[in-house]
């Protein structure tokens, strides 16, 4: 979708995504802390079906939500595919951040813009931020291209390193210990 839209279509997509994520934040304000839902709003999780008036969310990962402030998904599930020699480190430094980032409207908005770098469309970051910054709550500082780029660089470093360590774990498991590796790893990811 990102690689086929013109400027007006892209702006409409971002406006649509921002409007749909705003519904999540409204739900959380109305229902929280009883029930709160999280959303990974990156642009690659959305489609605009032909003839539909709004974007549709298609994230295939496990839904993240809280009841009375208590996470309903066992955070340890995120560590199942983490190499065993790294689980303690991931638990200590990353797990909480992964579990909370998608409840924060600003962090979701930054992730939405930063994801355009991963999608090889850096020229769309400024137009996306233009749309996103128009709808930020009054008094909240706008998101800059620099902030989005910095977020992306850190995210890219973390996930590239993580994948490299998973490949090392697969090598050790299959070649050194001659055991079955239980996970399918992606091929080269262009970031």
Predicted regions and their residues:
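Alpha-helix capping and helix-coil boundary motifs
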Residues: 5-9, 30-33, 69, 104, ...
